[in-house]
Amino acid sequence: MGSEDHGAQNPSCKIMTFRPTMEEFKDFNKYVAYIESQGAHRAGLAKIIPPKEWKPRQTYDDIDDVVIPAPIQQVVTGQSGLFTQYNIQKKAMTVGEYRRLANSEKYCTPRHQDFDDLERKYWKNLTFVSPIYGADISGSLYDDDVAQWNIGSLRTILDMVERECGTIIEGVNTPYLYFGMWKTTFAWHTEDMDLYSINYLHFGEPKSWYAIPPEHGKRLERLAIGFFPGSSQGCDAFLRHKMTLISPIILKKYGIPFSRITQEAGEFMITFPYGYHAGFNHGFNCAESTNFATLRWIDYGKVATQCTCRKDMVKISMDVFVRILQPERYELWKQGKDLTVLDHTRPTALTSPELSSWSASRASLKAKLLRRSHRKRSQPKKPKPEDPKFPGEGTAGAALLEEAGGSVKEEAGPEVDPEEEEEEPQPLPHGREAEGAEEDGRGKLRPTKAKSERKKKSFGLLPPQLPPPPAHFPSEEALWLPSPLEPPVLGPGPAAMEESPLPAPLNVVPPEVPSEELEAKPRPIIPMLYVVPRPGKAAFNQEHVSCQQAFEHFAQKGPTWKEPVSPMELTGPEDGAASSGAGRMETKARAGEGQAPSTFSKLKMEIKKSRRHPLGRPPTRSPLSVVKQEASSDEEASPFSGEEDVSDPDALRPLLSLQWKNRAASFQAERKFNAAAARTEPYCAICTLFYPYCQALQTEKEAPIASLGKGCPATLPSKSRQKTRPLIPEMCFTSGGENTEPLPANSYIGDDGTSPLIACGKCCLQVHASCYGIRPELVNEGWTCSRCAAHAWTAECCLCNLRGGALQMTTDRRWIHVICAIAVPEARFLNVIERHPVDISAIPEQRWKLKCVYCRKRMKKVSGACIQCSYEHCSTSFHVTCAHAAGVLMEPDDWPYVVSITCLKHKSGGHAVQLLRAVSLGQVVITKNRNGLYYRCRVIGAASQTCYEVNFDDGSYSDNLYPESITSRDCVQLGPPSEGELVELRWTDGNLYKAKFISSVTSHIYQVEFEDGSQLTVKRGDIFTLEEELPKRVRSRLSLSTGAPQEPAFSGEEAKAAKRPRVGTPLATEDSGRSQDYVAFVESLLQVQGRPGAPF
């Protein structure tokens, strides 16, 4: 098949290149099975060079006016081959404007001798001149008559997600476009659900790829966790964020096999399951990609890791694949007993008896539906809303497709053939992006829906999947029926080249574009139009609705109320349209000359492909910078007054107060303190840096037998010789000072990630062997720490004002706390494995002069070296041990930073919601009026609603479910279920679904009245009581005048358009009037204490 046989399935795991003939090129699935039979999948990446006579598009001269709705500026931070990439969304631009920008002097490709020279310049200049990437644009550049390798219509088993579940995942089973320029990057990642991906470079400059064989993917993950501990602790699958860049030099240094390859225009790249890949663009170009699957992928999908820190990551329910294609393992899999062992060397099979049976049943079902539609076309009748659409048949588990909750009103009309309906879709409503007409097949042209009107899963509006709707029926010749794998005819073939993977998707939200403008384009790029299968949930917008409308959210029954979308979820000026249009029910129908409901309306659930959201902002200062300290703004209370009761000889807090340097040195006091610390989580005097004693004491008070959950036992006796998991990442010891390159990992940590706790026989200090740099097998009963071995009974740390704890010697023969050496950026362990000596000569004079906010009044003179809060340009300074005693939050950070420090001032700001005081009716508060200024006002109404968050089996979730919707438990009487409990609930379509309970949240909304009589409905987080300290942003906009806005921020029409219409249940839809119970409910909510408009 245009390739040489590379022997026993490519044992060297090199990237292979294939050149199929036109005949071989016709069957996509068959050719993928063939290249795997040659071992291409072992590299994680393969290149396919299509036949010269094949062209996906006749010309690219007509796309300059196409809009790139949300370009992403890629800001990269880091050094020494380890980088983090952040995204900043820019304004929309056309392809023509983007081309001119990419070719401008600032962004153009630098002069270079060859690709190797260009690669060196890429890694050398990665952090300079942030490029702009036009990524994740839903649509295709293929001509509609291209059948071979059409990225919009590959017809692989991934189509089961759409055909059986009715789920559309943009960029996963639909195509995405990517416009790149020099240095635009896709970071290390595997595909969502560890799927395959295909990438075609339509035109422009080449694209360089790096790939790691799937059998070595775990090694890359372990390396990334070591250098980015902050990210890994926040999310186990943090590489799915597509923010982590690791250079080939680092990969070579740590012995991780990888290959590289360059993709030229007109070439395909295919990535394989669990194949980590990364890369960059050489200049202006355009690529198109999507995901697909084979039979081999199913086992990968069952064990794929999921991002745990974001709700909108793609998750495909594997139920349909296992039930249909692995029926013999289905029951075991449902019970969690199907132990899958992945064999990365095994090639995929082209077909199976189960797949053939499913394909045949789809063809049979389609034929029956076509016959029925012809009969119905000759006898049109008006359908009843309550009648079922039709019974679905077939082995895939057919079900009745009903009207979704009766929430879409449709006019009567003749019924049509579903195929006609697919070919001649209904025109789009006014205001929606309409770029052309798209035929069935996803990659071909059909009417489009503005992305701003699509519902993102992160908004919480995706309901569970409907019973499988037999909705999407391809033509007879398009129905995929795989043929047996025939012996290939080998030609002069695949050269094992060096590189390759596929661009990482980014966050794109297209703006609304007038339909007239786009209709003038010969071949516009077209996003997809799909139908959401259930009523959308209305979001409350405090500034766009009246008080009466706001409280309707609580009065009406049904799980449809939702908290306002946070500003962080909205990524551009077009998001107002996103709020108003998201989650609506749409029906696509056409009947003869008029618009009418079709019995075979196509219902789809839509999900977005995982994109790289701005999970954080780039750091505002370098790791070694010192912020100039301000005079009085940093005042903090001392963590311990020094007057604590010391009657309890084993109490930790009073013992700590005895360790100040201004007290007389007492070795016995240090012994007592170390012994008490050894019985307190995390039981290691060094790990406590990231788990302070105040946190451990609070945990013991609330739950005496609670453990840290990191392998630490929960009992209180001595932990010496027990193995637990250290909390200090190895990178904290290897970075700092002049260390600009990562160093080898510590060999004193076991393969299971644990290390034994060891205790000093003299001072009772307890540490992990790995944290203190001691070879475990050398520890005996009489082991002593470095300080006791040197008989330095009066030793104290030169960087802080507290005694006790784990000490090591410095290069100038002084002593230093290990935790101080870790947290002070310029300190450096010369022998990383043994954790000593410590070089502190690089600490700048400015750091020695910083004053600790906790001990500067206690100590007569400034001593030691302080660290500072990591929040932007905060100048709050403290000694490491003072901050640790005060409970300042310190966490592992990502390279090249070591420790992330959050002072109490910024920590409380981040958790302000938990500290909000209760607000009562009649209370005078301060809140923002429509004109953007803050005024005093009186609370005249209050309402609260408890909502549950649940996860459904198909990967969708709801975070605004009413307790009454759960049928398996009386939540009103018994309260919420326990976390993780499986519950049964009734959804808005009237059907019962099973889901997993996640959490319960109670939301509060208040109606306030300003001095001029105007009223507003606000959330609790937007209210400030007179007793609270007002944030600076509020104080600067606080007005003592009347709260009347100078001019309305929104006209009546704008406010009406901004509020999403609530889609009620069938009963609510039929009765448009207000019941007496509802009126009484609202009146009770709006009871006013005091006369409205009375002076405050």
Swiss-Prot record:
GO terms for molecular function: histone demethylase activity; histone H3K36 demethylase activity; histone H3K9 demethylase activity; histone H3K9me2/H3K9me3 demethylase activity; zinc ion binding. Binds 1 Fe(2+) ion per subunit. Belongs to the JHDM3 histone demethylase family. The keyword Transport does not apply. Its cofactor is Fe(2+). CDD domains: ePHD_JMJD2B, PHD_JMJD2B, Tudor_JMJD2B_rpt1, Tudor_JMJD2B_rpt2. 2-oxoglutarate binds at residues 133, 199, 207, 242. Residues 391-406 have a biased composition (Low complexity). A zinc finger (PHD-type) spans 731-789, 850-907. This is Lysine-specific demethylase 4B. GO terms for biological process: brain development; chromatin remodeling; regulation of gene expression. Residues 413-425, 632-648 have a biased composition (Acidic residues). The modification Phosphothreonine is found at residue 1065. Its main location: nucleus. Fe cation binds at residues 189, 191, 277. Changing residue 1095 to L: In MRD65; uncertain significance. A zinc finger (C2HC pre-PHD-type) spans 794-827. GO terms for cellular component: chromatin; nucleoplasm; nucleus. Residues 369-382, 444-458 have a biased composition (Basic residues). It is found in: Nucleus. Residues 430-443 have a biased composition (Basic and acidic residues). It is linked to Intellectual developmental disorder, autosomal dominant 65: An autosomal dominant form of intellectual disability, a disorder characterized by significantly below average general intellectual functioning associated with impairments in adaptive behavior and manifested during the developmental period. MRD65 is characterized by delayed motor and speech acquisition, variably impaired intellectual development, behavioral abnormalities, and dysmorphic facial features. Additional variable features include feeding difficulties, hypotonia, and seizures. InterPro entries: EPHD, JmjC_dom, JmjN, KDM4-like_Tudor, Tudor, Tudor_KDM4B_rpt1, Znf_FYVE_PHD, Znf_PHD. The keyword Metal-binding applies. PROSITE patterns: EPHD (PS51805), JMJC (PS51184), JMJN (PS51183).
